[in-house]
From Swiss-Prot:
GO terms for molecular function: neuropeptide hormone activity. It is found in: Secreted. GO terms for biological process: neuropeptide signaling pathway. GO terms for cellular component: extracellular region. Residues 21-46, 240-246, 264-266 form a propeptide. Belongs to the orcokinin family. Myotropic peptides that enhance both the frequency and amplitude of spontaneous hindgut contractions. InterPro entries: ORCKA/B. SUPFAM superfamilies: Pentapeptide repeat-like (SSF141571). Keywords: Cleavage on pair of basic residues, Neuropeptide, Secreted, Signal. Its main location: secreted. This is Orcokinin peptides type B. Residues 1-20 form the signal peptide.
Length: 266
């Protein structure tokens, strides 16, 4: 009986010690910071962003995607463009700004479709805006209806205004007289003239020599040092062919409608 009471007393003592906290258990696992970030108290996962997605203006540098916010801000060295409707400066980017505000652009591949006039330099495509401006060293042409100068471009100006052209491959289809030099195609004038290589033409009994196409322009003008011929309606002298034996040793002819003297021929 005494032993049973002693055992019961020992068990009660151990229970009291355990309740008092003298026997330490292993600490419970606390959630990590990463788990808190990935799973907030409501249990929904949090989406992580590398770039800003707020709707407020801020600066961004050296990132691949763009800010679609509707606020103006500065951007440098990024690949895509800002679609916001506010004016801002852009440098060295590949695509264009579709906003309707005027701004300056430099060294970009595509063009600004906005309806505001601005300067453009060293770009491949053209400005479709209806404002006059200067263009240099570009491949395509300006479809605007304003007169301007063009140099060193491949295609032609379809505008109806007279202007000067130099060193281009195609011709001016406008109905105005102008000078042409060093171009490959021809003038489609409807006037009679003499042509080399003795190819008679309709009733005018024209002579032709070493040319492929003709000038469709209806105005007389001067031509020098070009591969094809002038279709002006004026007579002139040609060297080195049988009809004019006093002329000699020249490759192409002068399409001007006036007589002239040539020197330093063999």
């Amino acid at each position: 009986m005494t032993a049973q009471m002693f055992t019961i007393a020992l068990l009660l003592s151990l229970s009291a010690i355990a309740a008092a906290g003298t026997i330490k258990t292993a600490p419970a696992r606390t959630p990590s910071t990463q788990d808190d970030a990935s799973f907030p108290p409501d249990g929904a996962p949090v989406k992580r962003f590398d770039a800003f997605t707020t709707g407020f203006g801020h600066s961004k540098r050296n990132f691949d995607e763009i800010d679609r916010s509707g606020f103006g801000f500065a951007k440098k060295n990024f690949d895509e463009i800002d679609r916001s409707g506010f004016g801002f400066n852009k440098r060295n980017f590949d695509e264009i700004d579709r906003s309707g505000f005027g701004f300056n652009k430099r060294n970009f591949d595509e063009i600004d479709r906005s309806g505001f006039g601005f300067n453009k330099r060293n770009f491949d495509e053209i400005d479709r805006s209806g404002f006059g401006f200067n263009k240099r060293n570009f491949d395509e042409i300006d479809r605007s209806g304003f007169g301007f100068n063009k140099r060193n471009f491949d295609e032609i100006d379809r505008s109806g205004f007279g202007f000067n052209k130099r060193n281009f491959d195609e011709i001016d289809r406008s109905g105005f007289g102008f000078n042409k030099r060093n171009f490959d195609e021809i003038d489609r004038s409807g006037f009679g003239f003499v042509k080399r290589v003795y190819v008679p033409r309709y009733i005018a009994n024209l002579y032709k020599r070493n040319f492929d196409e003709i000038d469709r322009s209806g105005f007389g003008f001067n031509k020098r040092n070009f591969d094809e011929i002038d279709r002006t309606g004026f007579g002139f002298h040609k060297r080195d062919y049988d009809v004019f034996p006093d002329k000699r040793n020249f490759d192409e002819i002068d399409r001007s409608g006036f007589g002239f003297v040539r020197r330093n021929v063999e």
